[in-house]
Amino acid sequence: SMTKKMVALCACPMGLAHTFMAAEAIEVEAKNRGYEYKVETQGSDGVQNKLSRNDIEEADFIIHAIAVTPLEMERFDGKEVYEVGLQEIIKNVSGVFDEIEADLNN
């Protein structure tokens, strides 16, 4: 299929709010741009919506919006990952996607 796929991992040690604000921002932006998407969160309630190796393999790009080293980082070995601060995602998710798409289309 020609549908673009993206996945993201949001991880913050400071409880839930930032993790979920970032995850929601990514999901809304991905949907608006016509991506298939899956966003894993790692917060004080553990891991939600966990990305499989298959999810990661099939993704056109991967965002890590993290304020802490996530669990099971080895899943991403050999993949290009865009690391972005949680605050940057929350404040300017469309700018983040613009930069990634420009980079990919280079």
Spans of features found by a protein language model:
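N-terminal beta-loop-helix "entrance" segment that forms/cooperates
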Residues: 32-59
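Short, polar loop motifs at secondary-structure junctions
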Residues: 66-71
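Glycine-rich phosphate/diphosphate-binding loop of Rossmann-like nucleotide-binding domains
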Residues: 9-30
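Ser/Thr/Gly-rich flexible loops in soluble cytosolic domains mediating phosphotransfer, phosphorylation
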Residues: 7, 81-106
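Short, solvent-exposed amphipathic alpha-helical segments in soluble enzyme
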Residues: 22-27, 80-81, 99
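Short, well-ordered alpha-helix to beta-strand connector turns
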Residues: 59, 78-79
